[in-house]
């Protein structure tokens, strides 16, 4: 099977609406991301419903806690059968290492474990507000390096950082990029954005795209257009 590059970010407060959307798209064309709001509203059974429909799921809960608690949450995600799960890299090396080690018994069936560096909504002024007097890019590199040194599979990062991180951390280290908007789309609340083709060419491995697909009149056609544009490069 072709490794789908597109991860569709589901953003619904009604489960029936979410499943109605999901039933309009093909699991061969994308993966799905379930975040904090939907998981809190609908729980693990919603993820199981997506699995029944053939979709791989990125469980985007950004765990950040003491090592024991965080690693057990990661293990629970593995038990649920998700394809990818993430933790905040700012939780530190011990937390990330514990989370990686708890997945080792799952072997090839374990989910990808990804670190979150700097949220794409954050600018330098936001970092300064929490006591970090650094450029976002500098903090991203610092946390991404810590993530790799902790043995994780990759990081979430903006497309602007992808090229630098690929060069710094190697081709095998996966880069998952939100803030992706197909040409002509509304910027939304993401500050650091890029088109799908630009992001892949910059070094991103997977692209998180939400409203341009979920709010489209024909989401399957939008997905096909994005995938075709990526296949032609």
UniProtKB/Swiss-Prot annotation:
Q: Which Gene3D superfamilies match?
A: Aldolase class I
Name the reaction it catalyses: orotidine 5'-phosphate + H(+) = UMP + CO2
SMART domains tied to this protein:
OMPdecase
Please tell me which top-level EC class this enzyme sits in. Answer: lyase
Cite the binding residues for substrate.
11, 33, 60-69, 120, 181, 190, 210-211
Give any Pfam family that matches.
OMPdecase
Q: What is its EC number?
A: 4.1.1.23
Q: Which PROSITE patterns match?
A: OMPDECASE
Tell me the GO molecular function terms. orotidine-5'-phosphate decarboxylase activity
**GO cellular component term, pick one:** cytosol
InterPro entries for the chain = Aldolase_TIM, OMPdecase, OMPdecase_AS, OMPdecase_bac, OMPdeCOase_dom, RibuloseP-bd_barrel
Q: So, what pathway does this thing act in?
A: Pyrimidine metabolism; UMP biosynthesis via de novo pathway; UMP from orotate: step 2/2
Keyword list (alphabetical) reads: Decarboxylase, Lyase, Pyrimidine biosynthesis
Which Gene Ontology BP terms does the record give? 'de novo' pyrimidine nucleobase biosynthetic process; 'de novo' UMP biosynthetic process
Q: Where is the active site?
A: 62
Please report any disulfide bonds recorded for this protein chain, giving both cysteine positions. none
Q: How does it assemble?
A: Homodimer.
> What is the purpose of this protein?
Catalyzes the decarboxylation of orotidine 5'-monophosphate (OMP) to uridine 5'-monophosphate (UMP).
* Membership in a protein family: Belongs to the OMP decarboxylase family. Type 1 subfamily.
Under HAMAP family, the record lists: OMPdecase_type1_B
What name goes with this protein? Answer: Orotidine 5'-phosphate decarboxylase
Which source organism? Answer: Vibrio parahaemolyticus serotype O3:K6 (strain RIMD 2210633)
Gene field: pyrF
